[in-house]
């Protein structure tokens, strides 16, 4: 009898310890606070290509990326951005501007399995943007995206954006 009780307790303990590892989506879910923002690219002008950089000079309160996994298993995102940025271009100098935006949409992550980088995809207003996960720890997340903007007057502009979040 004691042997059967011991085996039952051991079986329950073994089953309890067999908890599956959280998925990349589950590990990313939560509220992240923006701590760093930078963009770089080249703008085509009538006098030629002009390299520019944009860096944050002031990150205001409530700059959050909220990645939620809802009870119905949908995954929603709300990204609030309110940053004072410094734009720098050779020959033009530097000037400040405000970057304010709220993105509402859906998201999913792709685990690269150690072969390719992990990725985060956000879809908002019918457009999907992919972010390479450069680094991801329990309390920090660094993302990079490369986006091409097509302007009817200036043509195609490509920008690289890197953002860092902390919990």
What feature does the model see in each segment?
Residues 14-17:
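C-terminal motif of bacterial Sec signal peptides marking the signal peptidase cleavage site
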Residues 1-4, 19:
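Positively charged n-region of N-terminal signal peptides that target proteins for export
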Residues 19-167:
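Lipid interaction determinants
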Residues 5-10:
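Sec-dependent signal peptide hydrophobic core
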């Amino acid at each position: 009898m004691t042997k059967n009780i011991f085996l039952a307790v051991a079986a329950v303990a073994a089953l309890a310890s067999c908890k599956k590892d959280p998925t990349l989506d589950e590990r990313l879910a939560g509220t992240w606070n923006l701590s760093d923002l930078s963009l770089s690219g080249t703008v085509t002008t009538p006098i030629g290509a002009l390299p520019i950089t944009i860096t944050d000079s002031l990150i205001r309160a409530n700059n959050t990326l909220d990645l939620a996994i809802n009870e119905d298993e949908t995954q929603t995102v709300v990204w609030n951005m309110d940053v004072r940025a410094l734009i720098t271009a050779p020959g033009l100098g530097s000037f400040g501007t405000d970057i304010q935006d709220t993105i509402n949409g859906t998201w999913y992550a792709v685990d690269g399995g150690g072969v390719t980088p992990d990725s985060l995809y956000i879809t908002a207003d019918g457009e999907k943007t992919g972010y390479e996960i450069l680094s991801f720890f329990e309390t920090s997340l660094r993302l990079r995206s490369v986006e091409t903007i097509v302007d009817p007057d200036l043509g195609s502009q490509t920008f690289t954006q890197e953002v860092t979040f902390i919990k």
